[in-house]
Amino acid sequence: MHIPDGVLSINVILSTYVALMGVTYVAFSRISKIWSSSLAGKTSSIAALTFAAQMINWPVPGGTSLHFVGGALSGIVLGPWAGFTAMLIVLLVQALIFHDGGLTALGANAINMAVVAVFSGYVLYKLLGRRSTWIAGFTSGWLSVFLAGALCGVELWLSNPISITPLVVMALWHAALGVIEGAITASAIAYVKKKAPQIIEV
């Protein structure tokens, strides 16, 4: 899902960067009111786990890749704003040090994985979590990956409207990957709720 440099149009680059700056401002304003050593430790742990998982990539047609995201898990464990921050840190490190995702595409990558994946997973889990941890965790993980992948496809299509292939490919592949991520998210949340339920922010 990491979009490299040279793929997006200038309009998509600018619009996603503007959106990212707005979300980042709100996130830092919210986090400054609740930040603690406990939250810092959890954020660092989730960021490290997500970083490791995202480094396993499979290339797909259309100029991008397929990989685990971890957005739903980040949002559920940390809350949406700290979850966003953890994902943004991961994406910055990947782009600046490992060149995984381009700097010009950082806005788009962050909107997809740090905003859409985190917030959609968090909201859906909050709606379903009281009924079944497994159902809520699975559907949150699946939806977060599918929406992030589909939006990535939209950004690629807007940058090259001649071909709809990237949109279709990204949506279909991430619908499939979402099944695996949903299972991992559900398993992780079930384990955490059993061993240390107090650390979950939902």
Segments the model singles out, each with a brief description of its role:
Residues 135-145, 163-202:
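C-terminal transmembrane helix-loop-helix hairpin of multi-pass membrane proteins
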Residues 14-15, 40-45, 69, 84-88, ...:
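Hydrophobic alpha-helical transmembrane segments
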Residues 2-73:
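Hydrophobic transmembrane alpha-helices
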Residues 9-15, 107-115, 176-180:
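Membrane-interface loop-to-helix entry segments
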Residues 73-82:
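Alpha-helix C-terminal capping segments
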Residues 111-152:
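Short helix-perturbing small/polar motifs within transmembrane alpha-helices
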Residues 55-63, 89-120:
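Interfacial aromatic-anchored transmembrane helix boundaries in multi-pass membrane proteins
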Residues 20, 50-53, 117, 121, ...:
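Alpha-helical transmembrane segments of multipass membrane proteins
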